[in-house]
């Protein structure tokens, strides 16, 4: 326990070595208390592709807030860290680095290339862990996992083999999305569709007998070398007589048949479509129905192969131009129709994908999806926050396609299938015995292993492992809405299939971090923010405060430095009031302060302001805890901010100066006790969000770490509505006088006459009993509080609940301006009355709302009417003065 805070809040000093101290003290590990309820979270594993961005900071801050609070509440918490190998993304990064030296992965070979990728992984994993430390992420590093760890690899192999045995993983030749740059297959959700400028190329296919030509149109003329038919609708009278005949494929000059198929739409274009089964998913199905050949005319790098004839070796887009030119030369080009159309692009490399016939491995999704959908109607369902994302999840599951899981990469989980020279295939968790077997060179989609993350990290398939039995299913997952299908849905159906239960109880969905203008952050816009730059300038606590308070669950948040300034200012305020309290503490211990607070609550010591702040503290604890439980961190933060800044700092701390500057030593001890006790509860409430600064201040007056200190709970003894109402009225009076002074530019230092008229005897007694506070904050020359006060002829006035306040200012006041002010105030009360009246005239509200809520509205109506009537009277009095 240290003894003094620095005069100025400096986050760099506060946060410098704190994280290492936490690690050295092992405060992030599970408590091991078997009597405590377990609460576990697995980190959304960041890709080892580079440094973390603001989205990653959000992904880790929110679950860290949750786990820190649960740890303080006495749960046996596990916050498990780890990283994802991110197959295609990481391999692309390493290949780009090698390309700078003119080296390709093929130059190195698989083994040496993978050595380079592991070097990359080690480099960036260290960077990511350093960033986690700077953000204060309270994970248990003794359980750190990586998706290519042997334990996780074992789980991947078992899942693959089990699904294969059930017939839910199969190998087949189908049209898939092909990334020519990465030279790998992609799943549908790894394809981003963008509107691009393109064209419909219209060309003539001449009938075999030369009697007429059929006009077809395509956006990809370079694929025509793979055409194996043209199709017309069987009900299209224009072409019925041509079905079964042949046309001549231009340039290639080979015959292809005219087939009848519903795929051809008579209403679209000429009603004739070219069929390229190896390069279009719809054409592939037509080809299957008509037993057409499948002619692949492209290499895996997007260049044309030998079947493209003179265009072989050309890039597909160069071949497009050359093909169109050739069609024009031979008179087969009809027209080029410019248009904008949607083209799929690889999410990772950004290049246009190529629909391509390829032999791949697939997961049959039908039954897995049905199981996931059905589970959402059981007690074991996954709860989404906000709930609307449950509908998003179900929609995707209801419309899911088979999942292509093989990738033509080297970095990843190699598919556990082996082939021999006889054409036999073996699928198993271990390599087959004997010689002559060669393992499938493809690897699995990164999301295949990520889908097992919640249970593979806990030791599965060893269901007897201590972590699996204790911490699985996990409690909460935090992630962005953009990967609900990529990751969340897959974890759900894989967990249901292999563990028999949901992978997590709750899923908290957050949005995206956008720039100040609402744009998505991207390299192309140059608007990305490095979170470490923000931490260096403002501190991690300020960034965590922004990330937790920026938006509601599921909503995007806009980053701005103005918001960061506000966050820093708030922490600076906390620092300054903490310094004030600790400087006036006189060695008082927290234990003794807590005992003295008991005397305050039972009325044996202290004053009404002490009981007021404890009452409000109690309400704050209740509301913050309630909103934390609903993952409404923004609401909880707003409540904390208002209590700390407005009620505690601006009011209570100022009110205590009346005692601390007095000669009453016994009363000073009580005031110091309430200050320290309240500060301590504030720091504990704030700790999950602001771990660094709260630990620093906590260490000034307490032993141990705030990380494992008890989280505040509601104390019924603090409930004191009388003190609350009284001090709120006192605040209203002081505010009214201050506002009136400000309106007529009367300096606070100038003594004035203050008249307080009230017919409420209890309020009159309360004001008189606490007149010292009124005098301290309003600086009156004369202060009169009575029910018998005559309304002055010329005075500033204000109406508060239960009282009227007059400030005789005849020589300072402009009557016309005061009248305008009163009319404005009258309009305000009328507006409030209209709002309440509308609610109370709504039968559905009165009948269905809770009785206490309805009564609250009725109380408001009485209060507003009283203020309205008093304001009307003051207007009449002012109007008399004018006359």
From Swiss-Prot:
Provide the protein's localization.
Cytoplasm
Q: What class of enzyme is it?
A: ligase
**Coiled-coil regions listed in the entry:** 809-883
> Which reaction(s) does the protein catalyse, per the Swiss-Prot or TrEMBL entry?
tRNA(Val) + L-valine + ATP = L-valyl-tRNA(Val) + AMP + diphosphate
The organism's place on the tree of life at top rank? Bacteria
The domain section of the record reads:
ValRS has two distinct active sites: one for aminoacylation and one for editing. The misactivated threonine is translocated from the active site to the editing site. The C-terminal coiled-coil domain is crucial for aminoacylation activity.
SUPFAM superfamilies the record matches = Anticodon-binding domain of a subclass of class I aminoacyl-tRNA synthetases, Nucleotidylyl transferase, tRNA-binding arm, ValRS/IleRS/LeuRS editing domain
Q: Which InterPro entries match?
A: aa-tRNA-synth_I_CS, aa-tRNA-synth_Ia, Anticodon_Ia_Val, M/V/L/I-tRNA-synth_anticd-bd, Rossmann-like_a/b/a_fold, tRNA-bd_arm, tRNAsynth_Ia_anticodon-bd, Val-tRNA_synth_C_sf
- Tell me the organism: Streptococcus mutans serotype c (strain ATCC 700610 / UA159)
* The protein's Enzyme Commission number: 6.1.1.9
Function, please?
Catalyzes the attachment of valine to tRNA(Val). As ValRS can inadvertently accommodate and process structurally similar amino acids such as threonine, to avoid such errors, it has a 'posttransfer' editing activity that hydrolyzes mischarged Thr-tRNA(Val) in a tRNA-dependent manner.
Entry binding sites for ATP:
523
Q: Alphabetically, which GO biological process terms does the record hold? A: valyl-tRNA aminoacylation
Q: Which GO terms describe its cellular component?
A: cytosol
Positions of short motif 'HIGH' region: 46-56
What this protein is called in its record is Valine--tRNA ligase
Molecular function terms from GO: aminoacyl-tRNA deacylase activity; ATP binding; valine-tRNA ligase activity
Which pairs of Cys residues are joined through disulfide bonds in the record?
A: none
Give the location of motif 'KMSKS' region in residue numbers: 520-524
Self-association state and partner proteins as the record states: Monomer.
Name the keywords, alphabetized: Aminoacyl-tRNA synthetase, ATP-binding, Coiled coil, Cytoplasm, Ligase, Nucleotide-binding, Protein biosynthesis
Family, similarity comment = Belongs to the class-I aminoacyl-tRNA synthetase family. ValS type 1 subfamily.
């Amino acid at each position: 326990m240290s003894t003094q805070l620095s005069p100025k809040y400096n986050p760099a000093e506060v946060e410098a070595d704190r994280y290492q101290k936490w690690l050295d003290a092992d405060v992030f590990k599970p408590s091991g208390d078997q009597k405590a309820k377990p609460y576990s979270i697995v980190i959304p594993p960041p890709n080892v592709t580079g440094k973390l961005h603001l989205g990653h900071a959000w992904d880790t801050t929110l679950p860290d807030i949750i786990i820190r609070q649960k740890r303080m509440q006495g749960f046996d918490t596990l916050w498990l860290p780890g990283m994802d190998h991110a197959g295609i993304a990481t391999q692309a990064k390493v290949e780009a680095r090698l390309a700078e030296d003119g080296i390709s992965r093929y130059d190195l070979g698989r083994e040496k290339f993978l050595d380079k990728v592991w070097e990359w992984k080690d480099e960036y994993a260290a960077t990511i862990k350093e960033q986690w430390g700077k953000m204060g992420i309270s994970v248990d590093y003794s359980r750190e996992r990586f998706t290519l760890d042997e334990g996780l690899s074992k789980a991947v192999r078992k899942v693959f083999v089990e699904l294969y045995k059930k017939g839910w993983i199969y190998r087949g030749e189908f049209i898939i999305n092909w990334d020519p740059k990465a030279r790998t297959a992609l799943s549908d959700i790894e394809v981003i569709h963008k509107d691009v400028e393109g064209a419909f190329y219209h060309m003539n296919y001449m009938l075999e007998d030369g009697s007429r030509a059929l006009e077809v149109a395509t956006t990809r003329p370079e694929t025509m070398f793979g055409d194996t038919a043209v199709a017309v609708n069987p009900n299209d009278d224009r072409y019925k007589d041509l079905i079964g005949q042949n046309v001549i494929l231009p340039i290639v000059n080979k015959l292809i048949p005219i087939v009848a198929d519903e795929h051809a739409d008579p209403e679209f274009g000429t009603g004739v479509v070219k069929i390229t089964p190896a390069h279009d998913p719809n054409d592939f199905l037509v080809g299957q129905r008509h037993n057409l050949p499948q002619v692949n005319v492209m290499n895996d790098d997007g260049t044309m192969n030998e079947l493209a004839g003179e265009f072989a070796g050309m890039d597909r887009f160069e071949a497009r131009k050359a093909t169109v030119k050739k069609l024009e030369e031979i008179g087969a080009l009809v027209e080029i129709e410019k248009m904008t159309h949607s083209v799929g692009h690889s999410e990772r490399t950004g290049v246009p994908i190529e629909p391509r016939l390829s032999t791949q491995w697939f997961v049959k999704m039908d039954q897995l999806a049905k199981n996931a959908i059905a589970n959402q109607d059981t007690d074991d369902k996954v709860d989404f926050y906000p709930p609307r994302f449950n509908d998003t999840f179900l929609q995707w599951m209801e419309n899911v396609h088979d999942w292509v899981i093989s990738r033509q990469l080297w970095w990843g989980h190699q598919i556990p299938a082996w082939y021999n020279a006889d054409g036999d295939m073996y699928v198993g968790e271990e390599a087959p015995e004997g010689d002559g077997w060669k393992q499938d060179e493809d690897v699995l989609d990164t999301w295949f292993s990520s889908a097992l993350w919640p249970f593979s990290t806990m030791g599965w398939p060893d269901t007897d492992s201590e972590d699996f039995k204790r911490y699985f299913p996990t409690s909460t997952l935090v992630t962005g809405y953009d990967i609900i299908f990529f990751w969340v849905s897959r974890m759900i159906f894989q967990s249901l299939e292999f563990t028999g239960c949901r992978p997590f109880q709750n899923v908290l969905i957050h949005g995206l971090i956008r720039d100040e203008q609402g744009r998505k952050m991207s390299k192309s816009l140059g608007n990305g923010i490095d979170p470490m730059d923000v931490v260096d300038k403002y501190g991690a606590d300020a960034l965590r405060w922004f990330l937790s308070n920026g938006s509601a669950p599921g909503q995007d948040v806009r980053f701005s430095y103005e918001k960061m300034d506000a966050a820093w200012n708030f922490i600076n305020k906390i620092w300054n009031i903490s310094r004030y309290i600790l400087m006036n503490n006189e060695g008082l211990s927290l234990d003794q302060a807590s005992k003295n607070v008991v005397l305050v609550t039972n009325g044996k010591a202290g004053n009404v302001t002490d009981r007021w702040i404890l009452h409000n503290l109690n309400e704050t604890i209740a509301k913050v805890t309630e909103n934390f439980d609903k993952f409404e961190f923004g609401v909880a933060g707003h409540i904390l901010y208002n209590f700390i800044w407005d009620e505690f700092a601006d009011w209570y701390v100022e009110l205590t100066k009346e005692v601390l500057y007095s000669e009453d030593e016994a009363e000073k001890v009580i005031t110091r006790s309430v200050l320290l006790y309240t500060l301590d509860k504030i720091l504990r409430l704030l700790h999950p969000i602001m771990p660094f600064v709260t630990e620093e201040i906590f260490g000034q007056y307490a032993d141990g770490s705030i990380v494992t200190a008890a989280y505040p709970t509601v104390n019924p003894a603090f409930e004191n509505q009388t003190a609350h109402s009284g001090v709120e009225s006192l605040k209203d009076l002081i505010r009214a006088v201050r506002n009136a002074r400000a309106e007529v530019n009367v300096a606070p230092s100038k003594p004035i006459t203050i008249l307080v008229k009230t017919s409420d005897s209890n309020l009159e007694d309360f004001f008189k009993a606490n007149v010292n506070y009124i005098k301290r904050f309003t600086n009156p020359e004369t202060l009169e509080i009575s029910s018998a006060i005559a309304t002055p002829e010329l005075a500033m006035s204000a109406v508060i609940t239960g009282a009227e306040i007059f400030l005789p200012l005849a020589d300072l006041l402009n009557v016309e301006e005061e009248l305008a002010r009163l009319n404005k105030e009258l309009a305000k009360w009328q507006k409030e009355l209209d709002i309440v009246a509308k609610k109370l005239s709504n039968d559905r509200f009165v009948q269905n709302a809770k009785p206490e809520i309805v009564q609250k509205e009725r109380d408001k109506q009485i209060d507003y009417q009283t203020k309205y009537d008093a304001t009307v009277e003051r207007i009449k009095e002012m109007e008399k003065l004018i006359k």
